[in-house]
Regions:
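Conserved Walker B
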Residues: 40
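C-terminal regions of RecA-like/P-loop NTPase motor modules
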Residues: 7, 15-32, 49, 60-72, ...
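Conserved P-loop NTPase mechanochemical-coupling segment
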Residues: 1-13
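Conserved H-loop
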Residues: 79-81
């Protein structure tokens, strides 16, 4: 990993304008194939327009990210917070409506992926897949402008902070074989 050409800008309160400027400079030197923003709501969103609310500011930042992707012809991955509404649902699976502070994120994005770990909510079996939840993680592809939506399961090894393909335990496979 240390040999990969990854550049990290950890300047506090970086704005999308600063991200764009850095990405354009790096792209001009053929050193920018992707931009990742971790996370959108931490970006500096101060603007000259005084009467903007937080939702409008997040919408503008989301739009700037979309324009950056088009301008430089690279993927821009925006990480975003979710609101806590999914905590109240039966299976705790997040949905597009849980994107925090802006429907514009959903509108601008070509793809929206949401993460879920049922064991964090005390579940022992995932209601939808019926898989045991110990180490189970779910990537919910909630929007895909050019493809299918659905779910992808992975195993999360917390002690190593490692993600691998999910393979149900042998007992589950034996019990559910038909």
């Amino acid at each position: 990993l240390s040999r990969l050409p990854i550049l990290i800008n950890d300047h506090p309160m970086t704005s999308m304008d600063r991200v764009r400027s850095s990405a354009r400079l790096l792209k001009s030197k053929n050193r920018c194939d992707m931009v990742i923003v971790d996370y959108l709501q931490l970006c500096d969103m101060r603007s000259d327009q005084k009467n903007r609310n937080r939702e409008q500011e997040v919408a503008q930042a989301s739009r700037k990210a979309k324009l950056l992707a088009k301008e430089l012809d690279i993927p821009v991955l925006l990480l975003s917070q979710l609101n806590r509404a999914s905590d109240g649902s039966i299976d705790h699976r997040p949905t597009l409506s849980n994107l925090r502070e802006s429907g514009a994120i959903e509108q601008d994005a070509d793809m929206v992926m949401l993460l879920c770990r049922p064991a964090l909510y005390g579940k022992t079996v995932d209601k939808k897949s019926t898989y045991p939840t110990d180490g189970l993680g779910i990537v919910i592809i909630a929007k895909h402008r050019n493809g299918k939506t659905g779910e992808v399961y992975f195993h999360h090894n917390q002690s190593m902070t490692k993600l691998v393909d999910y393979i149900p335990p042998l007992e589950w496979l034996t019990r559910n074989a038909k």
